[in-house]
Every structure is written in C-alpha cells, then in structure tokens.
From Swiss-Prot:
Role noted for this protein: Hydrolyzes ribosome-free peptidyl-tRNAs (with 1 or more amino acids incorporated), which drop off the ribosome during protein synthesis, or as a result of ribosome stalling. Catalyzes the release of premature peptidyl moieties from peptidyl-tRNA molecules trapped in stalled 50S ribosomal subunits, and thus maintains levels of free tRNAs and 50S ribosomes.
Site positions (Stabilizes the basic form of H active site to accept a proton): D93
Entry's family note: Belongs to the PTH family.
Phylogenetic placement of the source organism: Bacteria, Pseudomonadati, Pseudomonadota, Betaproteobacteria, Burkholderiales
Protein name per UniProt: Peptidyl-tRNA hydrolase
Enzyme nomenclature, EC number: 3.1.1.29
Molecular function as annotated in GO: peptidyl-tRNA hydrolase activity; tRNA binding
Binding, tRNA: Y15, Y66, N68, N114
Residues under site feature: Discriminates between blocked and unblocked aminoacyl-tRNA: N10
Record text on subunit structure and interactions: Monomer.
Pfam families: Pept_tRNA_hydro
A GO-annotated cellular component: cytoplasm
Length: 199
C-alpha cells in the first residue's frame, strides 16, 4: 500500500513550467482531485498535504530543497510517519521515455536523475516505487547528421518548458497515471502497472 506520494521538481516560479517539474504537476493534480491544498511544512522541507484518495489516507509531498537535495525532505516525512521505502511512490521526469509515456516500477538505479540519487542515499534503499513521466531526451531533437558530433545539453533541456505538442502528450500521460491511482493507493501496484503499460 502506498502511503506517501512524492513529486520531484525545483522550487520557484521560474521552474514551474519546466520539464524537470513533471513530478510537481502530478502532485498538483492529485491535490486538486482530493480537494486539498499543499502547505509549506518546514519540518518536511516541502509543500505537504494529508489527503484522502479513493478512500485511503495518503501523504502528498513536493520537496522545496531543489532537486539534488530531495532526499532530505522525503526521509524527514517518512521517518516522522514511519513509512517504509516500498510504501513510497516518487513521481519524476524521465529522459529515457518519450513524452506521452508513463511507467511504474519498483527499485532500480537513478538513471542519472539527481533527485532519485539523493532519495536513495537518504533512505539507504532503492526499493521505493517510481512513476516515470516521459519528457524525452535532447538527443531526440538533434538531426542525424548533427548527432555524431553533438553532446546533448541535458541540464539545459530539463530546465526548459516542453514544446506545446510535448506538453499536451505529457499532460495526457499524467491523466493516465491519475486513472490508476485508485489501484496504487490500495496497494494493487502490479495491476496498476499492467494497466498503465498497456496504454
């Protein structure tokens, strides 16, 4: 059963619309659906709400520590409420999936994602769930001829807003993720994964 859903992103209005904040977009939608408001909670170093989602009590968190310090926020809340790593779902932007794709998985490496890297270090475990929201990779935007010599600027890419057509399909993928949340919060994660990966 998932007791904590974390969305990763960077704090500040200048980052709100950037690809790296896809995790925040999901949490904002969940809070709206639950009719709750995230509030600044200093002891958790983030914006926090306790929500009732599909009959289950769930904690929602958006760390306000900047991406590479996300673990500080996650572990503060997890320790306070005695939440185990496998009861945590972290929603994050995923370079290795195209826009419009969203996948669930338990455990694994960070894939170069600094937020995941820090969460793993703070929890001393990789065994937490991830909701991977595809944003694509900058190499996908480079022409074949230019690709040979070009090194894609990942840092610049994730800190820019998606193009309109990308935003539309990312929004649609978040809607699909929201549709499986009843299963997720009830602990039916295998079923949720199958449904999400079928779409």
């Amino acid at each position: 059963m998932i007791k904590l859903i974390v969305g990763l992103g960077n704090p500040g209005a200048e980052y709100t619309a950037t690809r790296h904040n896809a995790g925040f977009w999901l949490i904002d939608q969940l809070a709206r659906e639950a009719g709750t408001t995230l509030r600044d909670e200093r002891r958790f170093h983030g914006f926090y709400a306790k929500a009732r989602l599909h009959g289950e009590e769930v904690h929602l968190l958006e760390p306000q520590t900047y991406m590479n310090r996300s673990g500080q926020s996650v572990v503060a809340l997890a320790q306070f409420f005695k939440i185990l790593p496998d009861q945590i779902l972290v929603a994050h932007d995923e370079l290795d999936l195209p826009p419009g794709t969203v996948k669930l998985k338990l455990g694994g490496g960070s894939g170069g994602h600094n937020g995941l890297k820090d969460i793993t270090a703070h929890l001393s475990s990789q065994q937490y769930w991830r909701l991977r929201i595809g944003i694509g990779h900058p190499r996908d935007l480079i022409s074949e001829s230019a690709r040979a010599g070009a090194k894609p600027d990942v840092a610049n890419f994730v800190l820019k807003p998606p193009r309109r057509e990308e935003q539309d399909v990312i929004d649609a993928s978040i809607e699909r993720a929201l549709a499986v949340m009843p299963m997720v919060v009830k602990g039916e994660l295998d079923r949720a994964t199958m449904q999400l990966h079928r779409n």
